[in-house]
UniProtKB/Swiss-Prot annotation:
Cofactor-binding details, from the entry: Binds 1 [4Fe-4S] cluster.
Function: Ferredoxins are iron-sulfur proteins that transfer electrons in a wide variety of metabolic reactions.
Residue ranges of domain 4Fe-4S ferredoxin-type in the record: 2-29
This protein's name: Ferredoxin
Database matches in PROSITE patterns: 4FE4S_FER_1, 4FE4S_FER_2
Binding of [4Fe-4S] cluster, residues: C10, C13, C16, C55
Species in which this protein is naturally found: Moorella thermoacetica (Clostridium thermoaceticum)
Entries under PANTHER family matching the protein: FERREDOXIN
Amino acid sequence: MKVTVDQDLCIACGTCIDLCPSVFDWDDEGLSHVIVDEVPEGAEDSCARESVNECPTEAIKEV
């Protein structure tokens, strides 16, 4: 599984980072970005998909 963050939609609320710090972190501009090429198997169902579903601006997409 792969995920992306649309930087144009990200409002830096931090929800994804709080939910899934093994996949998301802050970038130099204070926005969320993906820090892994592939979501680790254990994180797919537990936090990555939850981050996709909980993002208030739908900036996170599963690809």
